Amino acid sequence: MGITTDLMHILVATIAALLAGMIWYQPFVFGNRWKELTKEYTGMTDDDLKPEPMRQIPMWFFVTLINAIVVYLVADRLDIQSRLSALKIAFALWAGFGLTFSSWAVIFARQRQSLWLINNGAFLMMQAIICFILVMWR
């Protein structure tokens, strides 16, 4: 495929993952529990945790875009073509990087495992969405 088409696929995967992440952290899903655990862990207040979308969304988009580019490069290099392989690579990337590095806060900074699980559930879901979209659109 051409570079323009590939970039479009990467952008769509990024946006889809962000939308899923936004739903994940809504109050009616895991948002209320996440907020409660984050306040307990960090000492932040409700005011500290008020969304600042003009600042937060562009940063979240940028880091998710980096992830999608890396997923694209890995899937392309490994010639991943099936749905099952897409989900396997998503799990492998999450387990090898997201799960391992994010566990440091639980191991060394006494972050509660429940907060870690909420965040890592989102990471895994977003990784799976990115991988699935990019592999199925190849």
Task: State what each model feature region is.
Residues 1-138:
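Juxtamembrane/disordered regions of integral membrane proteins
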